């Protein structure tokens, strides 16, 4: 622990900065800024050390290892001991100030590796485990990585990469019991570091963090081509941690369920660092196929996800209800509960206990990010007594941009701006839609080795231009209509936002996913709006007495498209429909890769 170390002048200035953020939180008079118990932190090292002091015996991580029947609990005290041990060993092996990659499945080993690097060793480079060997090799070279801490699954991949590169990589296996083939064991390094600490080695534990220096390089999973390396510092992350729990109550007894990849800043900041800041616990999912099983074992209270996960879970609930022949009964129960809620009586806990037991029985909050979600799904989950909120963020904002307050959620909105951060729209069109811009301590330092790209998105007044289009209502709630680069402009200068149409199509139960684009045909005076649609074949088969033909499917889909066209101006109407039978191309964040789909169509 370093709580008794006298702060340097720089550290004292950092503490004044942190106290300033807390003061702005306390001064915020917006009704939905309800929770004002944030403690000032100067950096992530300061955060985990103070959390270990405050919550020492509380559980930090729940993890189930291969072959185990139950989850293992790791306390905050054990966590800090492991972090200090690993950090001390890494410095002893000559890695201070180096770039160190972390890659693997979500686990406490991933978390401890990340913390050991960022809290005094060097610069952490979280890598996407879904990338190919060639892509990983390219990123290792770009980031000038000296060491890779990885799960056993990726050991051989990086052994090959190391052999192909001019410089050798120090490799550390999360789960190896001992060093073999020149690959270090994480547990052995932790023990080595603990022994060095007992002998008086203090270089890691007494390291003073420069909160303004680059500490993280996060490579974005671009939907338009080459990824960019987002440079973050400790202030970016600390600012997010201090402001994010102000519109959302997080308790020390909460258990977060970690299923999204930790290399994504959404999960890393909100599902990993933020729970540790608030003294909560994190339960690691063993993989997507184990979600339901692990939910019942961990019995979490909070769950971060993306639309695809929430929509699949919600769809599964209703499919099970229909199979049991209880659809009418459940709908009556939902109607009854909605009525009693109006007089302050929430019966969901009693009425839907059997349904919510699928999630472990204690889940109180689900937060959706990464892309727009159907508000009907959020409301539908809420009907069962689980509050479902939508948020908004970007890697470039560490990632917090906006979040719906738990006391005043708006399912159609991405949320409100956090205390101390700023949100605005610029270059508004005749419909009042403009580009969303964000300013605050959460905004990145810039793109790694890309000064021109950085200058294109961060203006001279330090506003980050997100590239997202939308508007902000009179109550401060923000809404997204699409991406600036994806706007379809008709010959008359009218704007069509494909994401907006895709979102409207997603509201149909018969549509699994869609891709909207423009097409110009010979002899046509203007562009046509085209929708490529992948239907929900299971539901369509349930609706029809015989196996549906392509024409049957298109008839159903056109009925859904016509519902949208009836309320849309002529220039925004979908004129052509393409039946899609396979999934669309996605990146590792599960987002549609538009340029790949456009090339397919061409």
Report each predicted region and the residues it spans:
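Structural core segment of the AMP-binding/adenylate-forming
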Residues: 2-14, 119-192
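Conserved pre-ATP/AMP-binding loop-to-beta segment of ANL
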Residues: 56-59, 194-219, 226, 249-255
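AMP-binding/adenylate-forming catalytic core of the ANL superfamily
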Residues: 131, 148, 440, 445-446, ...
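Conserved ATP-binding/catalytic segment of the ANL
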Residues: 417, 424, 430-490
């Amino acid at each position: 622990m370093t709580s008794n170390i006298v702060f340097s002048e720089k550290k004292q200035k950092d503490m004044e900065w942190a106290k300033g953020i807390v003061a702005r939180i306390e001064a915020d008079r917006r009704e939905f800024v309800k929770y004002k118990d944030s403690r000032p932190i100067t950096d992530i090292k300061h955060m985990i050390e103070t959390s270990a002091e405050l919550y020492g015996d509380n559980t930090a991580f729940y993890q189930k290892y291969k072959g185990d029947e139950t989850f293992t609990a790791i306390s905050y005290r054990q966590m800090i001991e492991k972090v200090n041990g690993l950090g001390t060993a890494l410095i002893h092996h000559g890695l201070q100030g180096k770039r160190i990659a972390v890659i693997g499945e979500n686990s406490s080993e991933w978390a401890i590796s990340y913390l050991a690097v960022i809290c005094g060793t060097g610069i952490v480079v979280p890598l996407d485990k879904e990338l190919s060997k060639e892509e990983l090799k390219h990123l290792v070279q770009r980031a000038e990585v000296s060491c890779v801490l990885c799960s056993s699954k990726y050991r051989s991949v990086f052994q090959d990469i190391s052999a192909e590169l001019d410089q050798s990589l120090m490799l550390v296996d999360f789960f190896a019991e001992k060093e073999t083939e020149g690959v270090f064991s994480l547990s052995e390094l932790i023990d080595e570091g603990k022994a060095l600490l007992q002998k008086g080695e203090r270089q890691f534990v007494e390291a003073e963090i420069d909160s303004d220096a680059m500490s993280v390089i996060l490579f974005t999973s671009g939907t338009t081509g080459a990824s960019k390396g987002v440079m973050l510092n400790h202030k970016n992350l600390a600012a997010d941690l201090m402001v994010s729990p102000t519109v959302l109550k997080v308790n020390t007894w909460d258990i977060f369920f970690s299923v999204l990849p930790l290399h994504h800043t959404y999960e890393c900041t909100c599902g990993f660092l933020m729970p540790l800041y608030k003294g909560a616990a994190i339960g690691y999912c063993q993989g997507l196929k184990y979600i339901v099983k692990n939910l019942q074992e961990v019995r979490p209270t909070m769950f971060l996800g993306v639309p695809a996960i929430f929509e699949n879970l919600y769809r599964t609930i209703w499919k099970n209800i229909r199979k049991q022949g209880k659809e009418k009964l459940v709908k009556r129960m939902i109607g009854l509960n909605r009525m009693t809620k109006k007089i302050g009586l929430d019966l969901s806990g009693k009425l839907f206990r059997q349904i919510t037991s699928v999630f472990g029985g204690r889940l109180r909050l689900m937060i959706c990010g990464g892309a727009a979600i159907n508000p009907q799904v959020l409301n539908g989950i809420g009907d069962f007594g689980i509050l479902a909120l939508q948020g908004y963020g970007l890697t470039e904002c560490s990632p917090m941009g906006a979040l719906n307050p738990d006391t005043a959620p708006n399912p159609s909105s991405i949320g409100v701006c956090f205390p101390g951060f700023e949100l605005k729209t610029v270059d508004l069109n005749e419909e009042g839609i403009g580009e969303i811009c964000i300013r605050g301590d959460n905004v990145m330092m810039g793109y790694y080795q890309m000064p021109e790209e950085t200058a294109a998105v961060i203006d001279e007044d330090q506003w980050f231009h997100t590239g997202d289009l939308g508007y902000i209502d009179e109550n401060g709630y923000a809404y997204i209509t699409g991406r600036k680069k994806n706007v379809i402009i008709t010959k008359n200068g009218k704007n069509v936002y494909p994401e907006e149409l895709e979102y409207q199509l997603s509201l149909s139960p018969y549509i699994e996913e869609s891709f909207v684009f423009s097409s110009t045909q010979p002899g046509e005076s203007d562009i046509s709006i085209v929708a490529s649609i992948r239907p929900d074949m299971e539901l369509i088969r349930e609706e029809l007495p015989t196996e549906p033909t392509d024409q049957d499917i298109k008839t159903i889909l056109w009925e859904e498209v016509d519902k949208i066209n009836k309320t849309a101006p002529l220039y925004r109407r979908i004129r052509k429909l393409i039946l899609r039978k396979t999934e669309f191309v996605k990146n590792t964040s599960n987002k549609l890769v538009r340029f790949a789909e456009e090339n397919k169509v061409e």
